[in-house]
Amino acid sequence: MSSVNANGGYTKPQKYVPGPGDPELPPQLSEFKDKTSDEILKEMNRMPFFMTKLDETDGAGGENVELEALKALAYEGEPHEIAENFKKQGNELYKAKRFKDARELYSKGLAVECEDKSINESLYANRAACELELKNYRRCIEDCSKALTINPKNVKCYYRTSKAFFQLNKLEEAKSAATFANQRIDPENKSILNMLSVIDRKEQELKAKEEKQQREAQERENKKIMLESAMTLRNITNIKTHSPVELLNEGKIRLEDPMDFESQLIYPALIMYPTQDEFDFVGEVSELTTVQELVDLVLEGPQERFKKEGKENFTPKKVLVFMETKAGGLIKAGKKLTFHDILKKESPDVPLFDNALKIYIVPKVESEGWISKWDKQKALERRSV
């Protein structure tokens, strides 16, 4: 220990060196001799000076006398002195980034209800700073408002109000608070100027984003109008069914040039093999494609399924192609015709189904039997009303 000598001078602290028969620890620490490190830390945490978390017991469930004494001291003095003390303690905790604890002390200071307006202003303003750090933006705004009621020229509160509104995506309110502080209170305040700059950048970003969305929406609308015009020009109708094939989601009817209704129409195509209960899907088929070209595409090539027994008639020369009419019947599609030629005819009226071409490929030898079983009423029932 350090001490003052007989002449009033300072004596340098001496290191404790145990002599023969002396305890290994100095007398001040002898009570910790037989305790583990965890037990020592727990014991020290009950001492206010070393306390890192609140422990209101004496270790055995009793009262922590030292802590209770400190609590009593906190409320000694005049109301403004007590409130000021809470404010100072809160400020220390705020500096240590212990925002929740600091907020609690500021709240205790306000609960004193002292009559010193400047202290109450600081307590509200400082608690607002804690709420801002804790992302409780609406509470921050409320406390700033209370502080500004006391002192309408508190620039920090305008800044915190602006920042809180900004975080809530309320740019108009954020800009209003910062602009008022800049124009009416402190034109040179760097925090306010920076906040105005941040708001301006955000406004520009949102404006650019909105303009882009409007352009894209207008472009989609223009493309939609062009596509509808192209289909009307070609006398094409579309019929929706109750249960569209999911694969149709992978294709979409479109114009080769989206902004030219006279350019080629491109269709997705559903190719049905009704006698086999199978189907194919082709994502894009030009309206200038002939029926024969589409048949060649799906039947020629190394398709093992058409080489199996019972499927030997699925070759381009041994099949017929049928398409469903608007009335629910069938037509035989000439293989030399383009789909443009077929779809534009007023009679028979062959529509698209779910915005896709739909053709039936049937072996010639099985075609009569399949046609005889075609049920017009069931075909109509498959469609949406």
Swiss-Prot record:
Disulfide bonds: none annotated. The keyword Membrane does not apply. TPR repeats lie at residues 83-116, 121-154, 155-189. Induction: Not induced by heat shock. GO terms for biological process: protein folding; protein refolding. Changing C140R: In CNS1-2; disrupts interaction with Hsp90, temperature-sensitive defect impairing Hsp90-dependent function. SUPFAM superfamilies: TPR-like. The keyword Hydrolase does not apply. It is found in: Cytoplasm. One of its GO terms (cellular component) is cytoplasm. Changing G90D: In CNS1-1; disrupts interaction with Hsp90, temperature-sensitive defect impairing Hsp90-dependent function. Residues 1-37 are annotated as: Disordered. SMART domains: TPR. One of its GO terms (molecular function) is Hsp70 protein binding. PROSITE patterns: TPR_REGION. CDD domains: CTWD_TTC4. Its main location: cytoplasm. Co-chaperone that binds to the molecular chaperones Hsp90 (HSC82 and HSP82) and Hsp70 (SSA1). Stimulates SSA1 ATPase activity, but not Hsp90 ATPase activity. Involved in only a subset of Hsp90 functions. Belongs to the TTC4 family. Monomer. Component of Hsp70 and Hsp90 chaperone complexes. Interacts (via TPR repeats) with HSC82 and HSP82 (via C-terminal MEEVD pentapeptide). Interacts with CPR7, SSA1 and SPI1. This is Hsp70/Hsp90 co-chaperone CNS1. It comes from Saccharomyces cerevisiae (strain ATCC 204508 / S288c) (Baker's yeast). The lineage of its organism: Eukaryota, Fungi, Dikarya, Ascomycota, Saccharomycotina.
